[in-house]
Amino acid sequence: MAERRWTARLLAFIGIIATLTSCDNVPWQEEKLKHGATTLSSSELSSVISHTDLDRMWQKDLKTMLVVRYPGSTGSQHVREHIKSTLGSMNAGWEVTEDAFYSHTPYGQLPFTNIIATLNPAAKRQLVLACHFDSKYYPPQWDGREFLGATDSAVPCSMILELARAQDDELKTLKDSGSDLSLQLFFFDGEEALYQWTSEDSLYGSRHLAHKMATTPHPPEATNTSQLDSIDLFVLLDLIGGPNPRFGNQFSSTTRWLSKLQKIERRLHALGHLENHPNEVQYFWPGLHVGLILDDHIPFLNQGVRILHLITSPFPAVWHTFDDNEENLDRTSIGNLNKILQVFVLEYLNKKSQNPIAEST
């Protein structure tokens, strides 16, 4: 009897160990579900935000982006070249590729080109930051007025480029470490409808890339996982740059990451790092539930990718008007959001600052 009891206890113990082992040894594509981000110290926060420069972003990126850039236009090509050359010049060593294709539109076959920048293509998992670089097409009948799409989405694209530039050293160190978690940037072409929004006349670039990734094995030798499985979290930035931005919650599956942004906002406010920011929370509202918004995340959402949609609610007052220009941008909120986003990315990637600023005593 005693021997049986001992055997039963041994088997139970082995079962517990096996269960714990199996819980830790989850498939790589499920690691995103239990991913935990780091929290930077106050000195590390100060170091991270000291690298970003709003004036630099404004001159180098935003002014370059503020041109008519509908698909196939000269402005579109100019902006694409700027994105590629900017990322290609950085020390982190981004792999920059194009996803070029033709698609039928209300104006016939038109060329589209997405840009994909990957910090470490060998990494199994990717945090994705995404935006669209095209501007809405208006026929030439508006007395010479041009739609520049400052919030929609020149500012979001500029913010992503500034993040890569400001955190170049940190991202290079992350890449050199061989981490299995990396950063990927998507710049979509053809988000806007060319005539009237339908499922066919919209989201040209994101629909094409989502399908391409769904049919491309990842890792390359895989038989049952695709590049879509590599996406830990898909963070889409849109309609950013107006005054008093608020970001609500569309997806319960990523509430904790919207809450993470709110916590970063609170901490930076408490440390005095946010300008003209009277309340500790102004931007990120995980308790504010908003309805589904059609945007470049939809083709990825439909494939099961987890989405964090950073789009202002309500939309900016200048949305889809000729007043969506540089003159009506709010520099202060853009600068504050730059800081919050850059901290969020480094914390998600579990990347400590290279040279933390010493805390005062």
Give short role names for the model-derived ranges.
Residues 102-105, 121-123, 133-137, 190-194, ...:
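Solvent-exposed loop/turn segments at secondary-structure junctions
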Residues 5-25:
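Cleavable N-terminal signal peptides of Sec/SRP-targeted secreted and luminal proteins
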Residues 44-52, 64-77, 101-106, 142-154, ...:
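Second-shell loop/turn segments in exported
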Residues 57-64, 74, 78-91, 155, ...:
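Extracytoplasmic/secreted proteins, especially bacterial periplasmic and envelope-associated proteins
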Residues 36, 71, 233, 239-361:
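Active-site-adjacent substrate-binding region
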Residues 145-260:
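Acidic/histidine-rich catalytic neighborhood of metal-dependent amide-processing enzymes
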Residues 116-118, 126-130, 184-187, 232-238, ...:
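Structural recognition of the beta-strand scaffold that forms the well-ordered cores
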